[in-house]
């Protein structure tokens, strides 16, 4: 059953702004809305960009997964978990300023800071150490991690996404 995704954390705007920003992402999401689909099927239809889109949807929990037997092998299938968004946020100007400083950052600028943080954290680093090292507010750091396909939070640490 499809549900509405409640967004009440202003930093979620960071990932939401990137969820449907390309035609491929929109088409992949349309596909997972209609049916359960494997990563292989997405990659066959949309190439590497489709694969990245589906991984982003999984990271942001826009899709649910299940394991199914196909051709004698267990295959992970994906399906859209939400059919709508309910956005309800209230925020101070300072917080909104920090959120939009990351959300509106050009992709090439974002990739540079993302790569520097990725190199800095190694096996994982406390978020406050990363914030201190890169002169970022906690809100900016949270937005960077939510926008990124390379970083994720594990408790108080920032780690490399998909490597733990």
Question: What does each model-identified segment do?
Answer:
Residues 2-26, 90-115, 140, 162-163:
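Short alpha-helical segments that sit at the start of domains
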Residues 46-59, 134-147:
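Short amphipathic alpha-helical interaction segments
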Residues 59-69, 146-160:
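A short, conserved structural fragment
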Residues 70-104:
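Conserved segment of winged-helix/HTH DNA-binding domains
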Residues 1-15, 59-64, 69-84:
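N-terminal leader segment of winged-helix/HTH proteins
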Residues 21-25, 31-41, 120-126:
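Short capping segments at the starts of secondary-structure elements
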Residues 25-33, 52, 65-77:
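Long, charge-rich, low-complexity intrinsically disordered regions
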Residues 40-43, 129-134:
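Short alpha-helical "recognition helix" segments of helix-turn-helix
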């Amino acid at each position: 059953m499809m549900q509405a995704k409640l967004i009440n954390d202003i930093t979620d705007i960071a990932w939401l702004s990137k969820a449907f920003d390309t035609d491929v992402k929109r088409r992949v999401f349309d596909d997972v809305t209609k049916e359960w689909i494997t990563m292989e099927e997405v990659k066959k239809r949309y190439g590497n960009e489709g694969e990245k889109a589906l991984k982003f949807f999984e990271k942001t929990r826009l899709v649910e997964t299940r394991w199914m037997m196909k051709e004698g092998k267990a295959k992970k299938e994906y399906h859209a978990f939400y059919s709508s968004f309910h956005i309800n946020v209230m925020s101070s100007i300072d917080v909104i300023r920090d959120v939009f400083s990351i959300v509106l950052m050009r992709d090439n600028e974002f990739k540079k800071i993302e790569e520097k943080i990725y190199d800095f954290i190694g096996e994982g680093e406390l978020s406050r150490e990363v914030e201190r090292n890169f002169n970022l507010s906690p809100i900016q750091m949270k937005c960077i991690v939510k926008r990124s396909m390379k970083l994720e939070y594990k408790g108080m640490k920032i780690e490399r996404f998909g490597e733990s």
